A protein has these predicted regions:
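Divalent metal-dependent hydrolysis catalytic cores, especially in the metallo-beta-lactamase
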Residues: 135-156, 173-184, 206-219, 238-241, ...
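Histidine/acidic-residue-rich, glycine-tolerant segments that coordinate divalent metal ions
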Residues: 170-173, 177-256
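Active-site neighborhoods of metal-dependent hydrolases
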Residues: 200-218, 264, 271-384
Length: 384
C-alpha cells in the first residue's frame, strides 16, 4: 500500500479541524455549576416575627471583649435589642429578661457573634467540579452569612438567580452580592470605549447587578475607560472593585484607580506598584512568561521588595491617601499562605473529610489549572 502524501494528510487534518470547530460552535462548553438545591424540611427556619436568643456570651465584632449572658431580640430579621441579663455562672433572674418570642433559642454556654462577610467568595467553578451546595454549606458552617462574588463566574443570570433564591430562603446559602466583569452577559462584546463602559454599567444596573469587578482585559485599565465606568457606577450607586492584573497595572495602579473612584481592590495586585519610588514596571526576569503561573505568582510575591519600604515617606503617603479616599483592601491572605508553606497546606487535617475529591484533583501541581502552580515550587520560592 502506498504511503499517503503530505498533501493528503494536510487535507485530512484541515477537515478534522473544521469538524472540531463546527462541533464546538454547536456544543458550547458548560459554563455554570449546578445551582443550590431547593431547601429541604429541617434545613433552617425563619425569619420570625420575634426571635429571642437567650443566655449567650456575645462578641459584637466591633472590638469589644466577650460579654454575657445576654438576650438578643430579633424582630422581622433585624436586631431590636441586646440586653445584659446577669453574670457568669449565676442564675439569671427572669424578671429582667425581654418578653417571650415566637421562637426562642437557648444559647447558654454558647457564643454568638455577627455573621462573617466574605468579600472575595467565588461560588465554585466547573473546572473544580464544585456544586453550589458544597460551597454554600462550607460557608454557612464557618459562619459566613454574606458573600460578594467578584466576577460572577457562573454567569450574570445564574448568579442573580441564586441571589434571589437565597433572599427568599429557597436555598441554604449566604446573602449574595453580585459583582460582574464589564462586558460579560450582554450582546455587545468587549468594553473598549468610555461610551461602551457607561452603557454596560447601565445595562448591568437594569439586570440587577450590585457592582463590578475590573480584571483581565487591557482595555479596562485604560484610564479613560476605567474612569468612565467608575463615574457611571457611582451615579447609579453601584459598587466597584478590581483585580489589578499584571497585564494592565502599568497603565493604572491601585492609587490611581482609587483617585478615580474605585471602591476596593481584590488580593493586593496594584498596591506595590503604587509604592514604586524608582520604577514604573516591576523587574521581570528575562525568561518571565505571565501564562506560566509559577512565574506569575512567584514573581508577584517578590514584587514587594521592589516597593518603598514600610514606614517610608512614600509608603505613608500612599496609605494616608487610600484611607482618606475611604478605599477598601480585600487582601485574601489565606490563599497565599500555601505559597509560603506548601506542605503544611497540602497536609491540613481537614482535607480528608471536607475537601471534595474533584477539588483535590484540580489543585494537584498543574501547568493549566489556575492556582495550581506547584509543579516547580521550591524552598527558595517560599522564603523569598
Amino acid at each position: 500500500m502506498s504511503r499517503p502524501s503530505h498533501t493528503s494528510w494536510l487535507v485530512v487534518s484541515i477537515l478534522a479541524l473544521v469538524c472540531v470547530i463546527a462541533f464546538a460552535q454547536t456544543q458550547p462548553p458548560q459554563r455554570s455549576i449546578q445551582p443550590g438545591p431547593d431547601r429541604k424540611p429541617g434545613e433552617g427556619e425563619g425569619p420570625f416575627e420575634r426571635l429571642v436568643i437567650r443566655g449567650a456570651t456575645m462578641i459584637d465584632g466591633a472590638g469589644a471583649p466577650p460579654m454575657g449572658p445576654v438576650d438578643i431580640v430579633i424582630e422581622n430579621n433585624r436586631i431590636k435589642e441586646v440586653r445584659s441579663v446577669g453574670f457568669p455562672k449565676v442564675a439569671i433572674k427572669e424578671s429582667g429578661r425581654p418578653a417571650k418570642g415566637v421562637k426562642e433559642i437557648d444559647a447558654t454556654g454558647m457564643y454568638v457573634m455577627p455573621g462573617f462577610v466574605d468579600c472575595h467568595a467565588h461560588i465554585g467553578g466547573v473546572a473544580q467540579g464544585t456544586p453550589a451546595e458544597y460551597v454554600y454549606k462550607l460557608w454557612m458552617a464557618h459562619g459566613v452569612t454574606t458573600i460578594r462574588d467578584p466576577g460572577s463566574g457562573n454567569g450574570v443570570d445564574w448568579t442573580l438567580n441564586e441571589r434571589e433564591r437565597s433572599a427568599k430562603n429557597q436555598i441554604v446559602a449566604p446573602r449574595i452580592f453580585v459583582y460582574v466583569r464589564p462586558g460579560m452577559g450582554w450582546d455587545k462584546g468587549r468594553v473598549t470605549t468610555p461610551e461602551l463602559a457607561r452603557e454596560y454599567v447601565r445595562w448591568a444596573k437594569q439586570k440587577g447587578a450590585d457592582g463590578f469587578k475590573i480584571i483581565g482585559e487591557e482595555s479596562l485599565f485604560d484610564p479613560e475607560i476605567m474612569s468612565a465606568l467608575l463615574d457611571e457606577a457611582k451615579k447609579l450607586q453601584m459598587g466597584t472593585t478590581t483585580h489589578m492584573s499584571q497585564t494592565g497595572v502599568a497603565r493604572t495602579n491601585v492609587i490611581q484607580a482609587a483617585r478615580m473612584g474605585m471602591g476596593s481592590m481584590e488580593h493586593w495586585y496594584g498596591l506595590p506598584e503604587s509604592l514604586f519610588a524608582d520604577r514604573v514596571v516591576q523587574d521581570f526576569p528575562l525568561d518571565y512568561n505571565y501564562n506560566d503561573e509559577s512565574h506569575r505568582f512567584g514573581q508577584a510575591g517578590r514584587l514587594w521588595k521592589q516597593a518603598a519600604p514600610p514606614g517610608s515617606k512614600k509608603w505613608n503617603d500612599v496609605m494616608d491617601e487610600l484611607i482618606k479616599l475611604n478605599f477598601t483592601i480585600d487582601p485574601t491572605f489565606t490563599i497565599y499562605e500555601a505559597s509560603r508553606d506548601l506542605m503544611r497546606a497540602m497536609r491540613a487535617e481537614w482535607h480528608d473529610r471536607y475537601t471534595l475529591p474533584s477539588l483535590w484533583k484540580f489543585y494537584q501541581p498543574s501547568r493549566e489549572a489556575h492556582g495550581s502552580y506547584w509543579f516547580y515550587w521550591t524552598t527558595q520560592d517560599e522564603v523569598e
